Amino acid sequence: IRERRDARNAPMAQVRGVKQDVMIRHMRANEAVRIKYDTKFAQSSNYWKNSLGMNKCIDSTGLIRQKAEFEKRIRQYQDTTGFLKGKLDFAKMEQMYDKRLEYAKAAMYFRETFIRTNELASRALKYHNGMQVEGPAGKPKKQYVVFKDNSNEWDEALDKEVYAVLLKNYREHVSADFLPDFYKTIDEKFAGDCAAYVNYVWDKSLLMKSGTKLFINKGAVKKDLGIAMGLDITEMMSKLAVPMQDLNDSIAIQERYLCAAKIRMEEDLPHYSDANFTMRLSYGQVGGYDLGGTPSGYYTTAESIVEKMKKSDSVIEYYAEPIMHELMGAADFGKYTDETTGKLQLCFLTNNDITGGNSGSPMFNGKGELIGLAFDGNWDSLSSDIFFDKKLARCIGVDIRYVLYLMDKWGHADRLIKEIGAK
């Protein structure tokens, strides 16, 4: 759990926060850039929020302390019974976890810096990790690869700044042992200026010349700083992966022993398999929860989304097309209005299960009628994979009336509404 908090969640949140600050600034300044990066930003911010939320839950529930107390019970059980003595080694396991945390933290910073963060790094990695080689098979000097023009998917100024900022950030957060060799080039030829390095490589490297033949066995390619950078990144990827895999294999053995000891110690209690990504039926009730002494409520309304849309100048995720302002600000939502509250209800809370793979699952009432679609969990449930608190964990579902309202008024899909017999 400490590894999850400190080596996975914290680095992911930190790097994505840095990256998203740059993205937001460029997206606000240019509508065309906003459209290009809207989905990319949403994908990035999704797990950025998830990481922050999970760490908040881990800390607020004292989860590490609770698990440490539970570990003491297993140790005492082993001391008393001798079960798996000589096999389950807590001291050895602790040492391996500490060592893996070091590598896992560096690996997360590495992944969040170099993998799918900008077009230059992506092309550099693609060149070294599999591209279609063209040209005659028997003539190596005439063999080449070509990058297709995909400039409609990225913005040069944004990607350059993101990469420069991430390179600097990476150096500030990992040991020098985990710096790819091209950092020496940054220091020796660019006086440590990551932005100058990125600008030069982007402008000069054959990697960024879409449609140009890169003859893979000629000197120009071998002298290309972008291609050299890609090789350095690939080599560091292996340097991180090999010890991680060795530690994973050794830890897996100890964790099997630990699981066996837990099951033996609690043999009179039921044990359930992991429900993540399995077919299952979950049941529960609609309702909110206690939020620090204040009832959370169990639904959101059109008014709440209007208030968010008004803040789109400061929070880009709240941006919406003018038609959405019109639809959400309507004086009367007609048949889609809730009879009890008199509101158009958007989302609602239940105490159903919302583990991995549940997004989009249908939610039925006691009559078998579709009332919504599950899609997320509240922040207080984000650590539920490792600690489930039934008082706090809630599933968020989108109200099917809201879905139908948009199908009708925005999508003008009245034919589909009639076809499915919605009422």
Regions found by a protein language model. Give the residues of each.
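Terminal presequence/propeptide segments associated with secretion/organelle targeting
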Residues: 1-423
